[in-house]
Amino acid sequence: MYLLDTTSTAAISIYALLLTAYRSMQVLYARPIDGPAVAAEPVETRPLPAVDVIVPSFNEDPGILSACLASIADQDYPGELRVYVVDDGSRNREAIVRVRAFYSRDPRFSFILLPENVGKRKAQIAAIGQSSGDLVLNVDSDSTIAFDVVSKLASKMRDPEVGAVMGQLTASNSGDTWLTKLIDMEYWLACNEERAAQSRFGAVMCCCGPCAMYRRSALASLLDQYETQLFRGKPSDFGEDRHLTILMLKAGFRTEYVPDAIVATVVPDTLKPYLRQQLRWARSTFRDTFLALPLLRGLSPFLAFDAVGQNIGQLLLALSVVTGLAHLIMTATVPWWTILIIACMTIIRCSVVALHARQLRFLGFVLHTPINLFLILPLKAYALCTLSNSDWLSRYSAPEVPVSGGKQTPIQTSGRVTPDCTCSGE
């Protein structure tokens, strides 16, 4: 019994020290650099890069899809903008005919209909193969982007060393439930602490799919690796965003974060789909962490600490909780030290974030701690034990919608509706 108590106390104490050091460094590096005033940059004389926006869609709600496409159509980008909407074998194509018909009037929009569901990765590649812009922006079909997102991301890509950039994620349905409010805060932390700190060193480890821009010249050399990703000899069909970002870093490109390029995405409003999403992300993170390990030698010491420390920290936290619970069950003795450390660290973290963001709502992020301890940590352990499972988990969750007619062939339409292809896509 003494061993259990000692293990729990030691693990949580080491975890507290590690996390304090990590969070302090993260907050320091996430702060904007205040440099001396510089002269205004000369007016850009080079032609603006052409931007291709790719929107993969599968069984998307017509209203959500329409909002996504409207936000893209309203971009203020003065350069050439083309939009490729890929319907990845959706079963509700008849339900979104009006959406496709409306946007097919805009000559910037093209629609690609795939005859069967092949996954987001192959849907992206289908559009990349039919487009030719200098920059490629992926936008998820359940997301809406602010009017200046393309301009701000493209501006960051003026540096030829930058291969990929991402914007700041928010939850478009943050007001729906307590969980969506929590996820919105989770996104803010992931972007404005983790990604912002990584961006200081030009190595954002995951440019998130709802709003990620890539340099085509960099992307072209990586497509084969991206399309044929294997894990333990089996195709890996999820975690596209993280994997493509790691490939960019391996190829020697910088990946950065643009905090004022705002994208709002629909997030799960109940625990079941949220935990499915977390399981999928955990598997992807573990897989690509192994892939990223050789990169750490050439990156900043902070990034090595970031990659390794996060995983070790979670292991220490899990060890402390498990041994503490075992000690409680076997001796009826409450592990007060473990509880005190976790409670204090939670309160301090939420208070610091509330001050940093200047938003009192982050005090409510204390609710994330029990979810993390009793749901997400066990889920991550399960993910680690089932890394070979490539089930998308959410791909077949949409209701079955009958589609009339025979099997379709992939068709691209541009600017108008044609009877053969139901004309628009996504």
UniProtKB/Swiss-Prot annotation:
Database matches in Gene3D superfamilies: Spore Coat Polysaccharide Biosynthesis Protein SpsA, Chain A
The UniProt record lists the keyword Glycosyltransferase: yes
Gene Ontology cellular component terms for the protein in this record: plasma membrane
Enzyme class: transferase
Domain of life of the native organism: Bacteria
Keywords: Cell membrane, Glycosyltransferase, Membrane, Nodulation, Plasmid, Transferase
Enzyme Commission code: 2.4.1.-
GO molecular function, one term: hyaluronan synthase activity
UniProt record, GO biological process: extracellular matrix assembly; hyaluronan biosynthetic process
Extent of the signal sequence: none
Membrane topology of this protein: Peripheral membrane protein
Keyword Manganese: no
Pfam families to which the protein is assigned, alphabetical: Glycos_transf_2
Subcellular location: Cell membrane
Region listing for Disordered, in residue ranges: 401-426
Compositional bias per record (Polar residues), positions renumbered to this chain: 406-416
Impact noted for substituting A39S: In strain: 41
PANTHER family: HYALURONAN SYNTHASE, MANNURONAN SYNTHASE
Sequence similarity: Belongs to the NodC/HAS family.
Purpose of the protein: Involved in the synthesis of Nod factor, a sulfated N-acyl-beta-1,4-tetrasaccharide of N-acetylglucosamine which initiates a series of events in the host plant species leading eventually to nodulation.
Protein name: N-acetylglucosaminyltransferase
Species of the source: Rhizobium meliloti (strain 1021)
Lineage: Bacteria, Pseudomonadati, Pseudomonadota, Alphaproteobacteria, Hyphomicrobiales
